[in-house]
Amino acid sequence: DTLRSRGLGDVYKRQVDAQRLAYADRDHFFADPDWVDVPVEALLDKTYLQQRASARFAPDAVPKHGDPLGSTALGADTTQEPSGTTHLSLIDSEGNAVSFTATVESAFGSARWVGGFLLNNEMTDFARSYEAEMPMPANVIAGGKRPRSSMSPTMVFDESGELVLVTGSPGGNSIPAYVAKTILGIFDWQLTPQQAADHPNIIARGSKVRVEIGVDGGAEVAANLK
């Protein structure tokens, strides 16, 4: 029984478009909320989300961020985060749960060993790939400012408040796409948690789409995304 046999012919295309739009907004708006006014409520507004969902763009285009507040004064940021992260999800016999993501940023972090552990190099999570012009990106480096992170430890609850899923992932910039795929796999594709986590990924940010080996009908999927 494959995903293709489930009648999901255009699921991957929709998944790719949704990721590209979400990353465009994330890259533009998200940074340390103590330094930047992140418009979380506006970005989650149903009318705004419907507007973004109806957006159309060429496969090789870089989708522009939305503008839920009517005006923005932030620069573009396309910084790629290294992938030196670990995640675990646990639920014990008494129902206690934890979704835990830890990272030292790059593999072995800063390569500095102190007191039995490695120091991280999280400063590489600040905006580094941007044009030297004003306005500056939301995630630009500053003293005392926390860098943006893609870590996404996640718990899903039903309408009654009961815990139904604990998930998360390593993977640098790709973490949001990995977590979304797992949630989609469990609740929309009716996969088991293990099947959903194991399912090959499609990651889309900007104009680039990465289709992992093992995606059902991968060649067809890649052709459909051109």
Where are these regions (language model features)?
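Structural signal for hydrophobic packing residues in well-ordered secondary-structure cores
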Residues: R6, Q19-F30, R52, R56, ...
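Extended C-terminal subregions enriched in glycine
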Residues: E94, G144-R146, D188-K226
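Hydrophobic alpha-helical scaffolding
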Residues: G9-D10, V38, A42-L43, D77, ...
